[in-house]
UniProtKB/Swiss-Prot annotation:
A GO cellular-component term linked to this record: cytoplasm
Cofactor binding mode and count: Binds 1 FMN per subunit.
EC number: 1.3.5.2
Protein name from the UniProt record: Dihydroorotate dehydrogenase (quinone)
Organism, scientific name: Helicobacter pylori (strain G27)
Keywords: Cell membrane, Flavoprotein, FMN, Membrane, Oxidoreductase, Pyrimidine biosynthesis
Positions contributing to substrate binding: 71, 116-120, 178, 183, 243-244
Amino acid sequence: MLYPLVKKYLFSLDAEDAHEKVCKILRTLSKSSFLCSLIHSQWGYKNPKLENEILGLNFPNPLGLAAGFDKNASMLRALIAFGFGYLEAGTLTNEAQVGNERPRLFRHIEEESLQNAMGFNNYGAVLGARSFNRFAPYKTPIGINLGKNKHIEQAHALEDYKAVLNQCLNIGDYYTFNLSSPNTPNLRDLQNKAFVNELFCMAKEMTHKPLFLKIAPDLEIDDMLEIVNSAIEAGAHGIIATNTTIDKSLVFAPKEMGGLSGKCLTKKSREVFKELAKAFFNKSVLVSVGGISDAKEAYERIKMGASLLQIYSAFIYNGPNLCQNILKDLVKLLQKDGFLSVKEAIGADLR
């Protein structure tokens, strides 16, 4: 496998420069259905035991790529070819924005973690929608992650989310409202019952597609449960837990700005998800993300109540064979415990 050599080269570069080089290649690959088929024949994996219908969407497997990798929905076709069961594009904002100053993406190699302070850099919802439609329809469900523009005052946040959702109504299979990025000033302050209630009441009037809320891992558990309950009562179909953490004690040499993801987040994200699932399993679709890098951890989250999973940092550290490795081993774990499908295993620890 060539990835160790490729990784060595990429990791010799600035983290964002390396990401941009990879994205350029993936955008080129996305233009060719033949090359995407070739990639899928090498790194894809299909097994009916992993298929599941959730909220009317057919997922070939539960493993998705989290938002932030493909910010402008420009390389979805190539990413699907690597075996993901679904993708989440974005974060898109209503207006284009450049994000925070560089450097703003860092590696913590010993901890197999990343720290990003990107700040929702994207081309804006109009160009994002145009990019999405270039190769639509897609072979797997695609979510659209929506954020607030940095210059928008808190008092006008609801209008801004309404505007970005309106621009994206004709793309994607579900929408995720991102109130939990630590890289937009005061964004996390919107994680409160009143705003979340207004947000989802507004959104459900605009679309019948599934709506998700992505939450931070740094909330007090009681506060998190109250916010999630408010979202569900107002019309949220699912909860994605968790976003990156601002707990800098989790790595040896943290940077001043940015949220941490990867293996350093595994324990914290798992603990938050466990409390979430105890309260809301069977009441909402639960998606677990944060520090998942192998089949064992993926399986644990599924048994804890996750219908779907997302990865990001592990894809950077482990390369294009990661999905295939996780999915193959996940099937073995399901078989070992006597489950006929992944659907049977969801929430097994809660029964």
